[in-house]
C-alpha cells in the first residue's frame, strides 16, 4: 500500500514559548475554495460550454480520458485562480476544488489533465477552431448583456487598444518592433461599454505579429462586432474610440461607410501644428498669467493626403506648468464625426478610452495574457482567448457584486479576497460540504455573491 509523504516544518518564533509545527497533511483541502463562485458565474453565462462546443475533437473516442471541455475549463479556471503555466497541472492534479470545477468527485474523481495533455490540446487547435472560439466568446458576452439590458441600450461604445507582448524564444511571427525596441507580438483588445456604465466589457482578443500596421485585423473585427451588435441592440448607436495609432485613412473610410460614430486620436504634423498655433498662443498667455496649466479647445476641418474627404478635427491647446520646471506645450488632436462642443468631445467622450490601459494591465499582470511561450502562433492565440475568457468570468462576478466594496477592484484583488480561501472538503452520500475559515475577513461579501449567483 502506497503512503503519501507528509511535509513538516518546525518554526521557533521569538515571543512564542512553544515550537510551531506546520504539517501539509490534509489531502482533502485546497487553497482555492472561493473558485466555486467563478464556476457559478460560468454556469450562468454558459461560457466554457459554448467555447468547448466550438471545438472539433479529432481524437479517437475510445482513447479519450479528458474531454475537450474539461481541458478547456482546466485552463480557464486555472488562469482565473492564478496558475498560468501548463506545468501547474502536476501540482493541481488532485486538488479537490479543481476537480469540483470540472464536475468531478472532489475526493475520488479522476486526476486532472497533465502538462503533456494540455500542451497537445493547445497545439491541436486550428484556424477554424480559433475563429469559432472567438465568435462563441463574443456571442456569450453580448447575449448576457442583451438579457440584462433588453431594449435599454441606447449607446454602445467600442474601445480598441493594443500593447506589446515581449517574446523570449523562437515563437512563430514574433518579430522585432522598433517602437517597443523588443521582439514581441502585438495583441489587440476590444471592449464594449453600454450607455454611461463604467465597465468596459472585454469581448475580443486578437494576437498579431510583432510588426505591421497597427490597424491590422481591426476592420474585420469591427465588421463582425457591428453585425452582432445591430442584431442584438437594433436601437443602439455604435461609437468607436481608439488612440492615434488607429487613425489611418482606410479605417476612417470604413467607419464612415459603416455609419457609426467615432472619435480617434490623431498624430500631430506640421499642418495641424499651424492650425493650433493661435489657440496655443492664447494658452501660453493664460499659463503665464495664472502660473497654472492652461487648456483651451478648438476645432477645424482637415484632410490628410490619403483621406477621401475632409473631417472634423478637435484641437486641444495645453500648456503644462509644474513647479521648478519650464512650461511645456502639449497640443493634441482628435478626428471625429460627433457634433458636440470640442471640450465635451475631448473630456467627456474621448478621455474615458484611457481606462483601456487598466484592462490591458489586468489581463497581462493578473491573467497572464502575455504567457505566449508556445512555438506555434495559433497555440498562443488560443492562450490569449483563455485569458480573455477568464477575464469575462471576473468581470461578470464584479458586475454581480457591483454594490459591494469589491465591485471596482482589479482582478488580483478579487482573486485574493474571494478565490484564495483555505477550504476542507467533506463529501457524504447526499451533499458536498466546504468548510471555510470562520475568521475569513471577506465572508459577508462572499456569501452575498454566492446567494445572488444561486438565485434565478
Predicted regions and their residues:
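Flexible loop/turn segments at secondary-structure boundaries
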Residues: 98-99, 165-167, 211-212, 246-250, ...
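Short amphipathic alpha-helical "interface-anchor" segments enriched in bulky aromatics
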Residues: 41, 345-382, 386, 390-397
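An anionic, glycine-rich sequence signature occurring as long contiguous blocks
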Residues: 4-24, 261-365, 448-456
Amino acid at each position: 500500500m502506497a503512503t503519501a509523504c507528509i511535509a513538516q516544518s518546525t518554526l521557533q518564533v521569538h515571543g512564542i514559548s512553544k515550537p510551531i509545527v506546520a504539517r501539509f497533511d490534509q489531502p482533502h483541502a485546497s487553497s482555492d475554495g472561493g473558485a466555486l463562485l467563478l464556476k457559478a458565474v460560468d454556469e450562468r453565462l454558459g461560457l466554457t460550454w459554448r467555447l468547448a462546443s466550438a471545438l472539433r475533437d479529432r481524437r479517437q473516442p475510445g482513447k479519450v480520458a479528458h474531454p475537450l471541455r474539461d481541458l478547456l475549463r482546466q485552463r480557464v479556471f486555472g488562469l482565473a485562480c492564478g496558475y498560468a503555466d501548463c506545468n501547474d497541472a502536476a501540482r493541481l492534479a488532485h486538488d479537490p476544488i479543481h476537480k469540483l470545477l470540472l464536475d468531478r468527485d472532489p475526493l475520488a474523481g479522476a486526476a486532472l489533465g497533465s502538462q503533456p495533455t494540455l500542451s497537445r490540446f493547445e497545439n491541436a487547435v486550428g484556424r477554424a477552431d480559433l475563429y469559432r472560439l472567438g465568435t462563441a466568446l463574443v456571442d456569450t458576452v453580448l447575449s448576457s448583456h442583451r438579457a440584462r439590458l433588453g431594449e435599454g441600450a441606447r449607446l454602445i461604445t467600442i474601445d480598441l487598444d493594443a500593447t506589446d507582448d515581449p517574446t523570449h524564444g523562437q515563437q512563430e511571427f514574433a518579430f522585432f518592433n522598433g517602437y517597443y525596441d523588443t521582439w514581441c507580438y502585438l495583441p489587440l483588445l476590444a471592449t464594449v461599454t453600454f450607455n454611461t456604465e463604467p465597465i468596459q466589457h472585454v469581448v475580443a482578443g486578437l494576437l498579431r505579429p510583432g510588426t505591421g500596421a497597427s490597424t491590422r485585423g481591426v476592420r474585420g473585427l469591427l465588421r463582425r462586432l457591428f453585425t452582432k451588435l445591430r442584431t442584438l441592440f437594433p436601437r443602439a448607436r455604435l461609437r468607436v474610440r481608439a488612440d492615434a495609432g488607429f487613425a489611418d485613412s482606410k479605417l476612417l473610410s470604413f467607419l464612415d461607410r459603416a455609419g457609426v460614430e467615432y472619435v480617434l486620436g490623431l498624430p500631430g504634423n506640421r499642418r495641424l501644428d499651424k492650425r493650433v498655433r493661435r489657440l496655443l498662443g492664447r494658452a501660453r498667455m493664460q499659463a503665464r498669467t495664472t502660473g497654472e496649466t492652461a487648456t483651451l479647445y478648438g476645432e477645424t476641418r482637415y484632410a490628410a493626403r490619403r483621406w477621401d474627404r475632409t473631417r472634423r478635427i478637435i484641437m486641444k491647446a495645453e500648456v503644462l506648468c509644474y513647479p521648478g520646471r519650464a512650461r511645456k506645450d502639449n497640443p493634441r488632436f482628435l478626428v471625429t464625426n460627433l457634433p458636440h462642443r470640442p471640450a465635451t468631445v475631448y473630456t467627456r467622450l474621448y478621455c474615458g478610452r484611457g481606462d483601456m490601459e487598466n484592462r490591458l494591465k489586468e489581463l497581462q499582470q493578473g491573467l497572464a495574457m502575455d504567457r505566449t511561450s508556445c512555438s506555434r502562433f495559433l497555440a498562443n492565440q488560443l492562450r490569449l482567448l483563455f485569458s480573455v475568457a477568464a477575464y469575462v468570468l471576473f468581470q461578470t462576478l464584479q458586475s454581480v457584486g457591483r454594490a459591494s466594496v469589491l465591485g471596482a477592484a482589479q482582478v488580483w484583488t478579487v482573486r485574493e479576497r474571494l478565490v484564495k480561501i483555505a477550504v476542507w472538503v467533506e463529501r457524504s452520500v447526499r451533499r458536498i460540504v466546504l468548510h471555510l475559515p470562520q475568521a475569513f475577513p471577506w465572508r459577508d461579501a462572499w456569501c452575498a455573491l454566492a446567494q445572488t449567483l444561486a438565485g434565478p
